Amino acid sequence: MLAKRIIPCLDVRDGQVVKGVQFRNHEIIGDIVPLAQRYAEEGADELVFYDITASSDGRVVDKSWVKRVAEVIDIPFCVAGGIKSAEDAARILEFGADKVSINSPALANPQLITDLADKFGVQCIVVGIDSYFDKETGKYQVYQFTGDEARTKATKWETKDWVQEVQKRGAGEIVLNMMNQDGVRNGYDIDQLNMVRSVCNVPLIASGGAGAMEHFAEAYKKTNVDGALAASVFHKQIINIGELKQYLKQQDVEVRL
């Protein structure tokens, strides 16, 4: 049985780590490299960096910090932000990232998923999906440009359909960002994860809602996700990653210690 992954998420804007609630009102958390180092030392299995305004600003992720992070950590890390071509992805991978993640650019050009998977291998290609539960329609809808409040918008895709589409096109992993839960710290959306898991045959990472150690255990036990991503509970030192792994081990969840 593969060990479940614990993945701190670092949202980056203007060279600093920030965190919002439900993708709004971002506050500065601190500098990128020291935080990355801290999480690697605490026992994180992987890190994810989102340059949150790159897509909405029409630019690619700022690569200067990618190289600095690669120099100081020895765990895999994934970078996202405005990657619109194989050339963009190649540069980020050359600077030391292990994976690239695409979100809004994949919605604008789904062929990009296939192009990247063909060039770099599916194991390098993550698709991030920002999913919002619309209480009026009772449906999960995919959103794009979520790094910028003014430009965030719904797409034509329902979450389940987009999950199936990106797999057909070569996504090697999916990160499901559950917008209603983001930063609220009241637990992952178990129903949504199970709905997506039922049609997802690649590794699935839960994102949005972690507030306590039991939320991680619940996600792993009730939905069979491969990893859980969290931000504010780690940034604010509410949860220590080493202690979280010991707790999960006691709950019979397979983790790397």
UniProtKB/Swiss-Prot annotation:
CDD domains: HisF (cd04731). Its main location: cytoplasm. It holds the Pfam family His_biosynth. Pathway: Amino-acid biosynthesis; L-histidine biosynthesis; L-histidine from 5-phospho-alpha-D-ribose 1-diphosphate: step 5/9. Keywords: Amino-acid biosynthesis, Cytoplasm, Histidine biosynthesis, Lyase. GO terms for cellular component: cytoplasm. It catalyses: 5-[(5-phospho-1-deoxy-D-ribulos-1-ylimino)methylamino]-1-(5-phospho-beta-D-ribosyl)imidazole-4-carboxamide + L-glutamine = D-erythro-1-(imidazol-4-yl)glycerol 3-phosphate + 5-amino-1-(5-phospho-beta-D-ribosyl)imidazole-4-carboxamide + L-glutamate + H(+). It is an enzyme of class 4 (lyase). It is found in: Cytoplasm. The keyword Cell membrane does not apply. Its EC number is 4.3.2.10. Heterodimer of HisH and HisF. Belongs to the HisA/HisF family. IGPS catalyzes the conversion of PRFAR and glutamine to IGP, AICAR and glutamate. The HisF subunit catalyzes the cyclization activity that produces IGP and AICAR from PRFAR using the ammonia provided by the HisH subunit. This is Imidazole glycerol phosphate synthase subunit HisF. It comes from Vibrio atlanticus (strain LGP32) (Vibrio splendidus (strain Mel32)). The gene is hisF.
